Amino acid sequence: MNLFDFFRERKKQSSASIAKERLQIIVAHERGQRSAPDYLPDLQKELIEVIRKYVNIDNDQVQVVLEDQGNCSILELNVTLPDR
């Protein structure tokens, strides 16, 4: 999916294509977890605790991803904040 596909109207997808897309996401996530450092789950828990001091959120509203890009690592934190 490229950037322009995101803004176009989506056609109804068959349940098979939706299942395939979800499975690809799960497989990619599992592959990423294999190379994740041991401290990443603890880091995610602590980040959630800090965010909860200021905003009421669920665990599934915070995603922490560590990407290795050559000689550097990128820690990406995505937080879905509730409406005010």
UniProtKB/Swiss-Prot annotation:
Which Gene3D superfamilies does the record match to this protein? Cell division topological specificity factor MinE
Q: Name one Pfam family in it.
A: MinE
Its BP terms in the Gene Ontology are: cell division; regulation of division septum assembly
UniProt keyword annotations, A-Z: Cell cycle, Cell division
Domain of life from the UniProt record: Bacteria
The answer, when asked if Protein transport is one of the entry's keywords, is: no
Q: What does this protein do?
A: Prevents the cell division inhibition by proteins MinC and MinD at internal division sites while permitting inhibition at polar sites. This ensures cell division at the proper site by restricting the formation of a division septum at the midpoint of the long axis of the cell.
Family assignment from sequence similarity: Belongs to the MinE family.
User: What is this protein called in UniProt?
Assistant: Cell division topological specificity factor
Q: Which organism is it from?
A: Azotobacter vinelandii (strain DJ / ATCC BAA-1303)
Q: Please spell out the taxonomic lineage of the organism that makes this protein.
A: Bacteria, Pseudomonadati, Pseudomonadota, Gammaproteobacteria, Pseudomonadales
Corresponding gene? minE
